């Protein structure tokens, strides 16, 4: 039986739609009355694990799920040993550096050395600032990072941006771009190598009109 890790939240509906097109119907997870965290597919040959976004690559890396759907932002932050199989082309957003619009900073390079930067994605932020050779103090937050600059705790934030509305409504502007992010189909490397064909058929079906990274 194929086990698929699905992230609760914004990516769930589109993930279920894509798996349905590949022959795996997990629509039961969209039922508001559902309280199960392990849900079988209608065909009975697969089951879905409903987990938090950041836990998807963990379940896949440890082989408790053979496939999963997660944002590229999460893959970049945690860098778990999983196979990045298909760019599913939904859940589009990007990682950016933002500051108060009243500040004089117009690029990350303008920020003062050793300033505080708030983020949920401290690993992504660390690599970015190391790449531009700017030492900063990273402050890890789990929500509402926009409050960092507004309260004076941080000069800047590194966060995901979709429409930019939250930034605008809180008087913040983007000053640098780290990378674009979309939902990705990921796989457990050993399971893919030992696959008798079931996993490959699902991956190929989900790869229709999308970008894939062939696996061996």
From Swiss-Prot:
EC number: 2.4.2.17
GO molecular function annotation: ATP binding; ATP phosphoribosyltransferase activity
Localization terms from the record: Cytoplasm
PROSITE patterns for the chain: ATP_P_PHORIBOSYLTR (PS01316)
Gene3D superfamilies: Periplasmic binding protein-like II
Stretches that traverse the bilayer: none
Keyword terms: Amino-acid biosynthesis, ATP-binding, Cytoplasm, Glycosyltransferase, Histidine biosynthesis, Nucleotide-binding, Transferase
Main location: cytoplasm
EC main group: transferase
Pathway: Amino-acid biosynthesis; L-histidine biosynthesis; L-histidine from 5-phospho-alpha-D-ribose 1-diphosphate: step 1/9
Keyword Disulfide bond: no
PANTHER family: ATP PHOSPHORIBOSYLTRANSFERASE, ATP PHOSPHORIBOSYLTRANSFERASE ATP-PRTASE
Domain notes: Lacks the C-terminal regulatory region which is replaced by HisZ.
Function in brief: Catalyzes the condensation of ATP and 5-phosphoribose 1-diphosphate to form N'-(5'-phosphoribosyl)-ATP (PR-ATP). Has a crucial role in the pathway because the rate of histidine biosynthesis seems to be controlled primarily by regulation of HisG enzymatic activity.
Subunit and interaction comment: Heteromultimer composed of HisG and HisZ subunits.
Name of this protein: ATP phosphoribosyltransferase
Source organism of the structure: Prochlorococcus marinus (strain MIT 9211)
GN (gene name): hisG
